[in-house]
């Protein structure tokens, strides 16, 4: 969040926030004995949950980030819910911040809109086989012509810390508000 709101680019291309596929999709290609907890190696890694990006060894699942925000997941459903929440918040931040930077910023383009194959985790908004993730709906909402948006600095706050944000009214319609 902090990186995005302090960035100043004319465009954000090939950007994304990663998250896992839904439980039903994962169960269709990950063997039952490997489903939980996910670990490097095996089907999770074969399907890009681990080692998909050299800069982040636990990408694209990002277990370390999930544990930072939510603690260790107790089951697969909780893990997926946590991961999809982070992806959704990240995608919403990307699209809304890009719009707040208009007219200097002219576009936000995701790296991968939909997955072409069974992927355990990734930056897509639509999982294989054409099932929208929660992030898809956040992106859709973030692109509506008129909206109120909050520029939130970060997701984790500690007791006693002052919460600061900016509220924006975005209007890309042809009508005055």
Regions found by a protein language model. Name each.
Residues 2-177:
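Substrate-binding clefts and catalytic carboxylate motifs of secreted carbohydrate-active enzymes
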């Amino acid at each position: 969040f902090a990186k995005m709101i302090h960035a100043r680019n004319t465009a954000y291309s090939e950007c994304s926030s990663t998250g896992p596929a839904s439980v039903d999709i994962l169960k269709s290609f990950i063997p039952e004995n490997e489903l939980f907890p996910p670990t490097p190696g095996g089907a999770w890694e074969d399907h890009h949950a681990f080692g998909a990006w050299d800069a982040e060894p636990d990408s694209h699942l990002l277990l370390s980030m999930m544990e930072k925000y939510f603690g260790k997941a107790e089951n697969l459903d909780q893990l997926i819910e946590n991961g999809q929440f982070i992806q959704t918040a990240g995608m919403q931040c990307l699209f809304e911040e890009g719009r707040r930077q208009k007219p200097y910023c002219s576009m936000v383009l995701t790296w991968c809109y939909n997955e072409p194959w069974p992927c355990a985790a990734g930056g897509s908004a639509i999982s294989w086989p054409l099932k929208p993730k929660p992030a898809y709906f956040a992106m859709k909402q973030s692109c509506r012509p008129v909206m109120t948006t909050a520029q939130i600095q970060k997701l984790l706050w500690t007791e006693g810390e002052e919460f600061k944000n900016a509220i924006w009214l975005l209007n890309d319609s042809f009508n005055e508000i």
